[in-house]
């Protein structure tokens, strides 16, 4: 498993806030670094898939367990 450089706890936030906060957090990371996002909004699955495709970032992993969605996103160039 990839070790994240930073973690964003977006649990309890509804669409579009998890993606908005992730975008702000990604601005702090360097190219190739990995952000882990924790969210509870089921809509975040499609949101993160679409956002990473549109933004040039790479969705490395997407998992769900105990009501928490965990995403690993590698920052693009």
What positions do the PLM features span?
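C-terminal structural segments of small proteins and small subunits
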Residues: 49-77
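Compositionally biased, disordered extreme N-termini, encompassing classical targeting presequences
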Residues: 1-5, 76-77
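Residue-level detector of transmembrane insertion/anchoring sites
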Residues: 1, 11-13, 31
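Amphipathic, hydrophobic secondary-structure cores in small proteins
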Residues: 16-58
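Short amphipathic
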Residues: 4-11, 36
């Amino acid at each position: 498993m990839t070790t994240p450089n930073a973690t964003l706890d977006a649990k309890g936030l509804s669409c579009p806030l998890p993606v908005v906060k992730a975008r702000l957090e990604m601005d702090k990371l360097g190219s190739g670094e990995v952000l882990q996002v924790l969210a509870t909004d089921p809509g975040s699955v499609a949101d993160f898939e679409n956002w990473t495709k549109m933004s040039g970032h790479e969705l490395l992993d997407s998992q769900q367990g105990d009501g928490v969605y965990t995403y690993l996103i590698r920052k693009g160039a």
